[in-house]
A protein has these predicted regions:
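Conserved phosphate-binding/catalytic region of the ribokinase-like
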Residues: 1-12, 17-18, 31-37, 179-183, ...
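Conserved phosphate-binding/catalytic loop of the ribokinase/pfkB sugar-kinase fold
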Residues: 107-111, 122-168
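Conserved beta-alpha-beta core of the PfkB/ribokinase-like small-molecule kinase fold
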Residues: 157-237, 253-255
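Glycine-rich phosphate/adenosyl-contacting loop at the front of the ribokinase-like
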Residues: 1-81, 93-94
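A glycine-rich helix N-cap at a beta->alpha junction
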Residues: 98-115
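Alpha-helix C-terminal capping segments
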Residues: 70-79, 123-125, 291-294
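Hydrophobic beta-strand scaffold residues
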Residues: 80, 106, 188-189, 246
Length: 334
């Protein structure tokens, strides 16, 4: 087989294009909603408007799991691109401006009609845990025709978020992108995203891991949920023969990375005050993939992920503030 041509993009992500509205709330607010604390619940447009009215104005900032990852990776010097659908409305313009300003290539045409740009109500409780209610809006309009075959073939890593598996059209877009990437000999990375996403799509996710995924990102709850066990070691034993690398984050306990026949235990990077855990897993993936595409060893990749995650949980919002590259370089020198 002829090796693939050198890519001009390091990481291409497919994901939901979302603007987050972040609010600090007490646990009583979460208890009064039909949601799972710490998880993501899908809601409709009417519910989103009602929740916005209940919570009041919050801090608006661009989000979306895979989008957060490629923004973080771009800040670390990685050549990145993103595929996701917004509407040509105010929030769509905010999302487009923010992701391009971060240095991420974003060419998906906005929808001119249909649902508005996706919005996620992120409720941060005093323990810094985030609970999300997401109205997918225009994101559900993403389909196979939005996948640029040439761009996928020209990208070293195709990164997919599990959340995107919910809308059927987006699911088919992911399947098409996977076929193209595998045909070109590129790596496919998947983030399981959320334990409840795993519950919804366990059979499909198991099939993806069995047949298509090279790099798997998950937290311990997602990984154990995937294999229907409470035993993390058992889940690792199940996944290790199937993927090149599995990276499992464990909150304040750091991360465990298995690959190349080795297991790397990565300690959590001290974050000082933990303000908001939104985006921690996204930024771990960003740091890891930055190291991976730069040819770093797995331990260094994990350390880069841990440092990036620690930065993003030290402030409100799911995207890094300035200086991430210098911070990671200082903590994990080449």
């Amino acid at each position: 087989m002829t090796p693939p041509a050198p890519p001009s993009v390091d990481v291409l992500a497919l994901g939901n294009a979302i603007v987050d509205v972040l609010s600090h709330v007490d646990d009583a607010v979460i208890d009064g909603l039909p949601v799972n604390k710490g998880g993501m619940t899908l809601i409709g447009a009417v519910e989103a408007q009602g929740l916005y009215g209940t919570l009041g104005p919050g801090v608006e900032c661009s989000g979306g799991s895979a989008a957060n990852t490629v923004v973080g990776a771009a800040m670390l010097g990685v050549r990145t691109a993103f595929v996701g659908r917004v509407r040509d409305d105010q929030l769509g313009q905010v999302f487009t401006h923010d992701i391009r300003a971060a240095g991420v290539r974003f060419d998906t045409a906005p929808a001119t009609d249909g649902p508005e740009t996706a919005v996620c109500m992120v409720m941060v409780t005093p323990d810094a845990h985030r609970t999300m209610c997401t109205h997918l809006g225009a994101s559900i309009e993403l389909g196979p025709d939005d996948v640029d075959e040439a761009l996928v073939r020209d990208s070293a890593v195709l990164y997919l978020e599990g959340y995107l598996w919910d809308p059927p059209g987006a699911r088919e877009a992911m399947r098409r992108a996977i076929r193209i990437a595998k045909d070109e000999g590129r790596a496919v990375a998947l983030s399981l995203s959320d334990p409840f996403a795993v519950d919804r799509h366990r059979a499909d996710f198991l099939d993806l891991v069995d047949n298509d995924v090279d790099i798997l990102f998950a937290n311990e709850h997602e990984l154990t949920s995937l294999y229907g066990t409470d035993d993390l070691d058992r889940a690792f034993n199940e996944v290790m023969p199937l993927v090149k690398v599995a990276a499992c984050t464990r909150g304040e306990h750091g991360a465990v990375i298995v690959g190349d026949g080795e297991t790397h235990v990565i300690p959590a990077e001290p974050a000082g005050q933990v303000v908001d855990t939104t985006g921690a897993g996204d930024l771990f993936a960003a740091g890891f993939l930055a190291g991976w595409t730069q040819g770093r060893n797995l331990h260094d990749c994990g350390r880069m992920g841990a440092v990036a995650a620690a930065e993003v949980i030290s402030h409100l919002g799911a995207r890094p503030e300035a200086g991430l590259r210098a911070l990671v370089t200082a903590k994990v020198p080449a």
